[in-house]
Amino acid sequence: MALERTFSIIKPDATRRNLTGKIIDRFESAGLRVVASKRIHMTKAQAEGFYAVHKERPFFNDLVSFMISGPVVVQVLEGENAVAKNREIMGATNPANADAGTIRKDFAESIEANSVHGSDAPETAAEEIKYFFKDEEIVG
């Protein structure tokens, strides 16, 4: 077991429905600590940069539009095997395929409006964390 950090976004569909606290409770109840957090309204440029890996995918423009449609909460979560644990808590990308008791099964509206984003690997987490946070903003 390794202590690691992962990156999380609580998406506009969840912030719009005041689910931020309930989602954070899921992370904390599973043993993850929030070591950095801020509520922001992403600019189009921020969203395009963050999701640049998907630039050639057919859903890119819709994803960017959705992510700038309202406030999001960007966070750094820390804990044992944080990346894998967060992905387990979130559930499958498509809420129809997510296990009962996961964030996406319980709160998501659709595959796009699926309430949360989480890093898929420790290397990705490090990149995503640096995209939104300075080192001094992360307090463990």
Swiss-Prot record:
It catalyses: a 2'-deoxyribonucleoside 5'-diphosphate + ATP = a 2'-deoxyribonucleoside 5'-triphosphate + ADP; a ribonucleoside 5'-diphosphate + ATP = a ribonucleoside 5'-triphosphate + ADP. Pfam families: NDK. GO terms for biological process: CTP biosynthetic process; GTP biosynthetic process; UTP biosynthetic process. It is found in: Cytoplasm. InterPro entries: NDK-like_dom (IPR034907), NDK-like_dom_sf (IPR036850), Nucleoside_diP_kinase (IPR001564), Nucleoside_diP_kinase_AS (IPR023005). ATP binds at K11, F59, R87, T93, R104, N114. It is an enzyme of class 2 (transferase). GO terms for molecular function: ATP binding; metal ion binding; nucleoside diphosphate kinase activity. Disulfide bonds: none annotated. Belongs to the NDK family. This is Nucleoside diphosphate kinase. It comes from Parvibaculum lavamentivorans (strain DS-1 / DSM 13023 / NCIMB 13966). The lineage of its organism: Bacteria, Pseudomonadati, Pseudomonadota, Alphaproteobacteria, Hyphomicrobiales. The gene is ndk.
